[in-house]
């Protein structure tokens, strides 16, 4: 609720302020696709601290929102941790950082690579029991804690602006929910409740629930019209594989989860290329 969100902002603001004042963190930002020699912008503390607070709170809640299906949030968290670990290890080596034209970080930042390895190892073990059908669950506490921790790790390695790329699965979960709610309110205001109940941008939100519903075959078809599906059809893209007619609901769930996991791996590869090669 609102009080929980307010508490998250308050605690995150205190933590970020402490990090800014007492740890080797400044207001410089590494901008994706822009070489350091071209732009290495500096934000004053009255802008930097609120932005970092927003990143931590946003990251925590994005992970929590994505954790709507068994194991769905686990692999994207692992790819985010892997990216931070690699950046921390290389950035903590002055010679390597200079050679690869990335920000040179404190030598102590290499310890963050150990924390990243722990997150990845825990994720692998967790997958054994969290894969569908799950025996244990991440829950709000786990998702919020891991999301805020991994988001803070990006701040330590000066890669805050890369979090939306490697963590694109989390970002799209949030965006799909915002788009869905905004579209519903617009149709409700302009066309009335009957139209708003019938026409949605996605069948459901967040996006993984849209895929879950879209890929579950029904002879009667969908009782909600999705603008997103209509747009894809007009572009000549069939969003529903034909073989889905033969899938059980459990198999559909597994396919959706694998679909999102594979995308998170591709986003990790893309982010690595952007960070280390596009300079």
Residue ranges and their predicted role:
Residues 1-7:
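Membrane-interfacial loop-to-helix junctions in multi-pass inner-membrane proteins
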Residues 10-11:
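Extended accessory regions or peripheral subdomains of proteins
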């Amino acid at each position: 609720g609102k009080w929980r969100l307010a508490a998250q902002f308050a605690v995150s603001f205190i933590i970020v302020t402490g990090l800014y004042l007492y740890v080797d963190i400044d207001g410089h930002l590494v901008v994706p696709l822009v070489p350091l020699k071209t732009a290495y912008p500096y934000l004053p503390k009255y802008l930097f601290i609120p932005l970092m607070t927003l990143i931590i709170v946003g990251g925590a809640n994005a992970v929590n929102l994505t954790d709507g299906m068994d194991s769905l949030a686990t692999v994207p968290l692992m790819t985010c941790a892997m990216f931070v670990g690699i950046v921390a290890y290389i950035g903590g080596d002055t010679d390597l950082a200079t050679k690869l034209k990335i920000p040179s970080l404190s030598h102590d930042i290499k310890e963050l690579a150990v924390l990243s390895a722990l997150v990845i190892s825990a994720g692998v073990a967790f997958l054994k029991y969290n894969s569908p059908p799950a025996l244990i669950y991440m829950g709000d506490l786990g998702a919020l804690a891991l999301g805020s921790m991994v988001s803070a790790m990006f701040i330590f390695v000066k890669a805050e602006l890369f979090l939306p790329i490697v963590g694109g699965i989390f970002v799209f979960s949030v965006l799909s929910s915002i788009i869905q709610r905004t579209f519903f309110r617009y149709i409700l205001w302009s066309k009335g409740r009957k139209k708003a109940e019938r026409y949605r941008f996605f069948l459901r939100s967040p996006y993984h629930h849209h895929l879950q519903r879209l890929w579950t075959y029904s002879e009667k078809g969908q009782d909600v019209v999705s603008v997103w599906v209509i747009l894809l059809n007009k572009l000549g893209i069939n969003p529903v594989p034909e073989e889905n007619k033969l899938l059980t609901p459990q198999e559909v769930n597994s396919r959706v989860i694998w679909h999102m996991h594979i995308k998170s791996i591709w986003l990790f590869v893309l982010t690595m290329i952007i960070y280390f090669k596009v300079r």
